[in-house]
Amino acid sequence: MACGEFSLIARYFDRVRSSRLDVELGIGDDCALLNIPEKQTLAISTDTLVAGNHFLPDIDPADLAYKALAVNLSDLAAMGADPAWLTLALTLPDVDEAWLESFSDSLFDLLNYYDMQLIGGDTTRGPLSMTLGIHGFVPMGRALTRSGAKPGDWIYVTGTPGDSAAGLAILQNRLQVADAKDADYLIKRHLRPSPRILQGQALRDLANSAIDLSDGLISDLGHIVKASDCGARIDLALLPFSDALSRHVVPEQALRWALSGGEDYELCFTVPELNRGALDVALGHLGVPFTCIGQMTADIEGLCFIRDGEPVTLDWKGYDHFATP
């Protein structure tokens, strides 16, 4: 049976399993009606994902739904926000009901995990793409931003950057990894990144600045440097790598992917000396490693990379959709 737009929405996307109290009216009308809790600031982010640009055209729909939501959740994590609502505008080349069922099941699994509600969106026909709008709350005056770093702050990253780029290389047959367990781990880091929501919430009163690593450490830390009007000195020997990555690529390739590979969706943040002890306590029990890789400074401009105590020049750049090849 043919599935039209409204029956498609009703069948696959209008299936609220638990309504949030702050949603007065969700899917099914011209607008959603929403209530912002008292003494909370609304945090909003929007991402567009296009087949062949942001994801491989043959990606499993369950992985696509997970990643599409996870990368938006990562934006909320970088602000220290609590997830709340999602809008989804989905463009499909045709109606494949098996594809839609897999996509929507995965999407709602992750929505329910974070106690979120899909509140609206749109569907249309065309090349596969989607735009997600995510909304969350952060207590007034406690949001993390890119512009708060100060000279003397210590620079940290969560997790092990570079894994996602390696996973993509495996999927594109640019990297051969014979160990199935390592290959699966690296591919999963690309297809199903872990938004660091709990870490972002814990950093609200500890970090001066934060950003999620979507385009690579060079690019994303560069945003903090620019917004905060100070420099950053990074010791390359301190960058953390996963065992799975280190076992299968030479150190220089691991370094390149960690700095410029992108799509890790870890957090990079800066913490004043006074808060380092509290940071160890706050993040230490969350099960995700976090590593100090350098320090913000007033005596240099931009990013300075150190190897064996000496400055080194790197010509790598983070991902840029409009960069000239």
Swiss-Prot record:
Mg(2+) 1 binds at residues 46-47, 122. Its EC number is 2.7.4.16. Mg(2+) 2 binds at residues 47, 75. The keyword Nucleotide-binding applies. Mg(2+) 5 binds at residue 215. Keywords: ATP-binding, Kinase, Magnesium, Metal-binding, Nucleotide-binding, Thiamine biosynthesis, Transferase. Mg(2+) 3 binds at residues 30, 75, 212. Substrate binds at residues 54, 263, 319. It comes from the Bacteria. Pathway: Cofactor biosynthesis; thiamine diphosphate biosynthesis; thiamine diphosphate from thiamine phosphate: step 1/1. GO terms for molecular function: ATP binding; magnesium ion binding; thiamine-phosphate kinase activity. It holds the Pfam family AIRS. Catalyzes the ATP-dependent phosphorylation of thiamine-monophosphate (TMP) to form thiamine-pyrophosphate (TPP), the active form of vitamin B1. HAMAP family: TMP_kinase. This is Thiamine-monophosphate kinase. The gene is thiL.
